[in-house]
Curated annotation (Swiss-Prot):
Gene: los1
Keyword Cytoplasm applies: yes
Domain of life of the native organism: Eukaryota
Gene3D superfamilies (UniProt xref): Leucine-rich Repeat Variant
Keyword Nucleus carried by entry: yes
Keywords, comma-separated and alphabetical: Cytoplasm, Nucleus, RNA-binding, Transport, tRNA processing, tRNA-binding
Protein name as catalogued: Exportin-T
Organism in which the protein naturally occurs: Aspergillus fumigatus (strain ATCC MYA-4609 / CBS 101355 / FGSC A1100 / Af293)
Similarity-based family: Belongs to the exportin family.
Length: 1032
């Protein structure tokens, strides 16, 4: 059997084995894992002599582990496994044989031994640590820990046990945690003294003999210290041994591996300080350990001081010491801010804070961002504490200047690009992203300082920015771009203090002192020569700042032409990233300065002309499966989407009130005519399904719609102050609508073209107004095709709601003409089968938009169009769809809307209220529909009971209650319109037909006649819940 198992493992792991045979071998080994007797064979395979191959032994022990952890080995058998493995360990590790197992096998054995510890230490293997410690000596008569291989294995198990029961980062169930806690208690009670004594012996006897042993031992001390008696580690003997290892930091040159030992020694102190204690005890511990001196010595050691700013600088040690500083300062601050801490302790903590401030600054200002990031948490805690103090006593803010000033200066210095950075390089993107993330974290700290001492923050930043611009004036393009970028970045952040409600001004005056300072900075920046901003990073910062503080230009209009000229240079920038970002920012700027840019409209349109040429790009022609093709396509899309901002900017500039309508038409046609020619040129090829031509048409239509969006902010039915453009301009955009419709009618099978056309339609409403109404049938015919998705239909319905709301006085006849064919397409979309979750979501959305459309028609006094002679044939379909939706147990939102539509129909067509205290006190907006009263009673009223009669309906569900409230509102509306006729129907037919008893009927009818609309909406859900009507 053993040979069979060994052969199977060998075959399964052999890459050149026959695939069929390999599959059989895999299956056999996997069956072995679940075989209750499989582990016995594997244990024998692992321990036998001579040793099997490494892979056989590894897999064999893995099977034993799997069986033990899977519960296939009972306690008695686990003792057998323990005896077998212990005998093996004594044979291989206990005699300094010199040929111990490779690390992967050692780790696997340690894993098994750790599991056996968890299962048997409480009962069955009480001598666990004694047995393992026996491996650390060459013979029972040895007086020292002199067996290197045994010591390494012992420490490996010690560290594994911590991972199993002591590591707080490991997620455990409640039972697992209870077991871990019980095992820790047992160790403390039985063996902790001898374990810590063994660490001292090992560190003492091997301090210069074996770096691997010393490092593993230090890691064990550092990990176990969090859950053992601190006195077992913090005692003079152990501290002397730790200080000896720290001494390695003072060496100029370390042999390979010594760095790990030195860093592990520092980590022990970090773990000691990280141990949970009362604030008083922690502060005394920091003082007792003399951590200030330890950190000073480490900071002044050759790797961190002598080698700083050289290639030999030891960043690993710097980060390790920074962790120690960070955890220490966090605890110092905690003692200062915690309630109930004695005054004496706080005085000690304050002294320690002053002592550690230089250490904070040393590592916070480290040139390596990883080191700086390590101490950000303690800086954040310190500033949070100082901010709390300043809020309680603002006078203390100035007293803390000695702490805040150096931190603020360090923050600003760390926000500067370092000398090795290369902005914009492809291979530097990760570094750039990490640096920007660091800037964000530093920016938060800077905001905290500003909230503690605003005056200090303003003075430091103002002085830095002013000095930078003075240096720029003197040295011009010779200035280091990093310094200018830093000043501009600080200007951008400064707005958090200066800008209120999007502006630097309130009623024409600067918001505050910060706004005054920022206005001074803006003057310096804008009056600087843009040619001095030689680096793309500073050029982008310039544009971002101009946009963010555009309110500055409202009060310094004489500077606008120069700034626009600078922007027109940057929108032509050779670097794509700068150019495309500038397109967006240019649009933002002119939108905010619209009233001041009319006099340069012609100049701008001419300057942008070459950038308004549209070139659609298909994904690169590359071999199938090349991953770059999708990236190329995304890049091309991103560039075109950015180009659209230029079209919007042109629309904004050309539509300023200071430009006469004829000039507006002239400028806009200069942009439109090339696009019209391009569409005409590509249309025939697009009809032949040429992909690039279709994409070109899509881009052209999107550009036309975006130009319209820039030209007019006006939307029908909104309260925006904008108005429709002049008639001449609207006439010009009527050509845009016509060109779009011609393309749409020819290419309506293209999803992309329909998408672009729908976008253009929504934007053309704002420039055409009611001129667009006669074209509605053509838009509907093009946008709602046989291939249109439900999502497209829902989006177009939403647009139609807006049109109806905006043009309700002019749309009746057109709506009357198009309603039937339009709704038939919607019904077709609703009826199509769904094939997945996305389809179901789109269907639900289409239903809701359909109901919203009906509500828009009814709410805008256009309900007559639904019952007109032309649309009479679809009236029954409209009603039946609403009835169906009102009974949808799986979509309460739609059901609720369906009842809202039925209520609106009832109030619109049911005639005047015949009951005092009418449904809502408003007269019907439309003439009553003959016979509709009886129709409401017989068709609408039963629907109110249909949904709650469904077996799976839960009347206590929050959404269900809302549906029932809406259904109750419908019943009250029917009663308001029909009075006693409805009550009689309920008494004699509807309620008895449901099996409701006479007493309940009278209570229900009485409530309906007595309560108002609001009252009955509340009553109906309660009625169903209390009377259990569903089961009657």
């Amino acid at each position: 059997m053993e040979e069979q198992v060994a052969n199977a493992i060998e075959i399964a792991s052999n890459p050149s084995a026959d695939p069929a045979l390999k599959t059989q071998a895999f299956d056999f080994v996997n069956q072995l894992r679940s075989d209750p007797s499989g582990w016995q064979v594997c244990l024998s395979l692992f321990t036998q002599t001579p040793q099997r191959s490494g892979i056989v032994r590894h897999v064999a022990l893995e099977v034993v582990n799997s069986a033990a952890q899977g519960g296939l080995i009972d306690l008695q058998a686990l003792a057998y496994v323990k005896d077998g493995l212990l005998a093996y360990l004594r044979q291989v590790y206990g005699q300094d044989a010199g040929a111990s197992d490779p690390p992967n096998i050692q780790n696997k054995i340690a894993q098994t031994i750790t599991f056996l510890f968890s299962a048997l230490y409480a009962s069955g293997w009480e001598s666990f640590f004694d047995d393992l410690l026996g491996l650390t000596q060459k013979s029972p008569s040895s007086t020292t820990r002199d067996n290197a291989s045994g010591i390494i294995f012992y420490l490996r198990v010690i560290n594994s046990i911590h991972d199993e029961i002591g590591d707080v980062l490991v997620s455990r169930s409640r039972n697992e945690q209870d077991k871990a806690n019980a095992l820790k208690d047992l160790i403390r009670q039985r063996d902790m003294q001898k374990i810590t004594s063994s660490w001292q012996q090992i560190l003492s006897e091997w301090r210069d003999g074996n770096d691997v042993i010393v490092e593993m031992c230090l890691k064990a001390v550092g990990s176990w210290v969090s859950w053992i008696d601190i006195g077992l580690v913090v005692n003079q003997t152990m501290l002397d041994l730790l200080f000896q290892q720290l001494g390695r930091a003072q060496k100029e040159d370390l042999r390979q591996g010594e760095e790990k030992v030195r860093d592990a020694a520092v980590d022990v102190f970090t773990e000691i300080i990280g141990k949970k204690m009362k604030p008083e005890d922690k502060i005394d511990m920091i003082i007792f350990l003399n951590l200030d001196t330890i950190v000073s010595q480490l900071s002044n050691s050759p790797p961190l001081h002598g080698n700083r700013f050289t290639f030999k600088y030891d960043t690993d040690l710097a980060e390790t010491v920074a962790k120690l500083v960070n955890i220490t300062v966090i605890d110092i601050v905690r003692a200062l801010e915690q309630e109930g801490v004695s005054t004496e302790c706080k005085e000690k903590a304050n002294g320690l804070l002053q002592a550690f401030l230089p250490h904070i600054l040393r590592y916070f200002s480290d040139e390596y961002d990883e080191v700086c990031s390590t101490v950000i948490p303690c800086v954040s805690d310190l500033l949070t504490y100082l901010r709390r103090i300043a809020k309680v006593n603002p006078a203390l803010a100035s007293q803390h200047s000695s702490i805040l000033l150096p931190i603020l200066k360090a923050i600003i210095a760390k926000m500067r690009y370092d000398e090795t950075s290369s902005w914009g390089e492809e291979d530097e993107q990760t570094d750039e992203a990490e640096f920007q993330e660091l800037r964000k974290r530093l920016g938060i700290l800077q905001q905290m300082i500003a909230s503690i001492n605003e005056q200090l923050y303003m003075e430091v930043v103002s002085e830095m920015v002013a000095t930078t611009f003075e240096n720029l004036r003197q040295s011009g393009s010779q200035m280091d771009w990093r310094d200018l970028d830093l000043a501009l970045h600080e200007m951008f952040l400064f707005g958090d203090l200066a800008v209120k409600a999007g502006s630097l001004y309130t009623k024409g005056n600067p918001n505050n002192q910060a706004a005054e300072r920022l206005i001074e900075m803006m003057l310096r920046m804008v009056e600087s020569d843009i040619r001095s901003f030689t680096h793309p990073a500073t050029q982008l910062q310039y544009t971002e700042i101009c946009v963010r503080y555009s309110s500055f230009f409202h009060h310094h209009t004489h500077l606008i032409p120069g700034v626009l000229e600078n922007f027109l240079q940057l929108v032509h920038h050779p670097i794509k990233k700068v150019k495309t970002r500038s397109w967006y920012l240019f649009q933002r700027l002119v939108k905010q300065l619209r009233q001041y840019v009319g006099n340069v409209a012609q100049t701008v349109v001419e300057a942008l002309g070459d950038l308004l040429v549209i070139r659609a790009e298909l994904p690169s022609e590359v071999s199938e499966g090349d991953e770059m093709s999708s990236e190329d396509h995304e890049l091309a899309d991103a560039i075109f989407n950015s180009q659209l901002y230029l079209f919007e900017a042109v629309g904004i500039i050309c539509s300023t009130p200071t430009i006469s309508p004829d000039k507006q038409v002239l400028y806009v046609q200069a942009v439109l005519n090339p696009i019209f020619l391009d569409m005409e040129k590509n249309l025939e090829a697009a009809k032949s399904q040429d992909e690039r031509a279709i994409l070109q048409i899509h881009h052209d239509i999107m550009a036309l719609g975006t130009l319209a969006r820039g030209f007019s902010d006006w939307m029908p039915g909104t309260n925006t102050p904008a108005t429709l453009p002049a008639p001449e301009v609207s006439a010009a955009f009527n050509q845009v609508a016509e060109a779009t419709l011609v393309a749409l009618e020819s290419l309506k099978s293209s999803f992309n073209v329909r998408t672009a056309a729908r976008f253009a339609f929504s934007r053309l409403i704002g420039v055409l107004g009611s001129r667009i109404l006669p074209q509605l049938p053509r838009w509907i015919d093009g946008l709602l095709t046989q291939t249109s998705s439900r999502d497209e239909m829902a989006l177009f319905l939403r647009l139609l709601d807006q049109v109806i709301f905006g043009f309700k006085g002019e749309i009746f006849s057109i709506l009357d003409t198009l309603l039937t064919p339009f709704l038939q397409r919607v019904f077709s979309g609703i009826a199509d089968p769904t094939t997945g979750t996305d389809d179901e979501i789109q269907l639900a959305e289409l239903k809701r938009e359909y109901l919203n459309f009906l509500l828009a028609v009814l709410n805008n006094d256009l309900g007559a169009v639904i019952i007109s002679e032309r649309n009479q044939p679809i009236f029954e379909t409209v009603i039946s769809t609403i009835e169906h939706f009102s009974k949808d147990i799986d979509d309460f939102t739609t059901a609720k809307m369906a009842f809202s539509v039925l209520s609106k129909m009832s109030s619109s067509w049911g005639g005047p209220d015949v009951i005092a205290e009418a449904s809502n006190g408003t007269p019907p907006s439309q003439a009553p529909l003959p016979g509709f009263g009886q129709f409401m009673i017989t068709r609408f009223s039963p629907l109110c009971w249909a949904l709650p009669s469904t077996p799976s309906f839960n009347s206590k569900d929050a959404q269900a209650k809302q549906v029932l409230a809406e259904a109750g509102g419908l019943q009250r509306t029917i009663y308001a319109k029909t009075g006693m006729e409805y009550l009689t129907y309920l008494r004699d037919r509807e309620l008895p037909g449901m099996g409701m008893g006479g007493e309940l009927i009278e209570e229900f009818v009485g409530a309906l006649s007595r309560l108002d609309l609001k009252g009955f909406r509340q009553f109906f859900p309660v009625c169903l819940s209390n009377f259990h009507i569903l089961s009657i």
